[in-house]
Amino acid sequence: MDGFSRRILWLEVVHSNNDPKVPASFYLNQVKELGGCPLLLVSDCGTENGIAAAMQCTFRAEDQDELHVAGEKSHRYCSSLANQRIEGWWSFYRRNRSNWWISLFKDMVDYGLLHLGNALHMECLWFCFSRLLQDDLNKVRDHWNSHKISKSAYSAIHGVPDVMYFLPEYYAHEECAISVSEEQTKEMEVHCQGEVDGSLYEEYFEYVLETEGRVYPGTVKEALTLYQHIIKLQNE
């Protein structure tokens, strides 16, 4: 999330966020897209943010500025509770959307359809629902970025995140991104990676779709039906 505009920059479904290379890849992709890095990067204290923090400090290693947030000071760890902007957003998301998904998966557990300790079940759940989850996240992100945020106790500046992000001068502010060259970003690519696709489970699930003439589910009902069908095949 951009600190000034509160615009969501990326919102991605991944197998796990414990691998620091995964969030680092999202951070680096954003730097490439913008051609620059933030003046200051703030993250919680989880070890998964270590590589992104190191990249930020490297990009700003030679900088000097009046705010004294260059070099190693260009990244700051803070507790989740202290980062009110992003914590407020996660609260918004949970109230308005994620509780629905959580309830769905809990119901699957309660009805004996999903066993959390079963690798096949978890991989099948990912295969059947991950694209739908990502589509849902994209809609939530786009809605948030295009709606008007009301004035709050944490920020006197308010408006539409997309407008604030792309037109900061309209709010008497200026673009603060620090230029990063293509050469610099290429040097960092070795330190991050996207999610690894093509597991044996996924190959099998794709085989089932192909041999039975099925298509990837486009609705939650279709995803649940496919999930139950694949699990049933394995139990026969």
Q: Predicted segment positions?
A:
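RNase H-like DDE/DDD metal-dependent nuclease/strand-transfer catalytic core used by mobile genetic elements
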Residues: 2-154, 207-236
